[in-house]
Amino acid sequence: MAKKELERRSYAFEIRAEETDQGKIITGRPIVYNSRTDLGWFDEIIESGALDNTDLTDVRFLVNHDTSKIPLARSRRNTPNSTMQLTTDAMGMAIRVSLDTENNFEARNLYSAVERGDITGMSFMFSIDGEEWENLESDHPTRRITAIGTVVEVSACTFPAYDATEINARSKEALDSARLAVETARSAENKRSVETDLEVLRLKTMIKIKTGGIKNA
């Protein structure tokens, strides 16, 4: 079976720094249901329940998706002793990250940046198991994600929002991926349309043969 392509999404939903009896904590919500995001080539909405059967076996917590750095936390099967706790609810997904600020200077830097408001958003990397497209014939269709296959990584994000004013900050890779998604969906829709037309023609021909409209050779 072909490996599913991983995608990234970033949002400006609140991320917080808290000091508790258990130490320095980061909380946030990387995935929010029913929020429309403009990805350049199309709008995208993550539908309620898209996380119901998602694989959350091993999820890492990074800063700006930098995989060259050691993860600042990790959720392994979301066990109680994991340094990142994941919660799925009616709103989407929330996280609670326990940072080792005593032994990791990057964890200290992140905590300070979130506390000061220098880092204000969350991002996540995921694969898609189910999707529905609307208005594919338009210049700006909508994709509704109905099932997220797996989440492999969550990041604190410096540029959290894909607002129109920030479109130039998007990577070419991200825009190319969005364009390809639209083209693939349109191609699949056209193929289904052709197959439907052929099936209708076949049924009409069979009816004519049975009613004597066409003579068998």
Model region roles, listed by residue range:
Residues 1-180, 186, 192:
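Signature of dsDNA virion morphogenesis modules
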Residues 171-217:
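Charged/polar low-complexity intrinsically disordered segments, enriched in acidic residues
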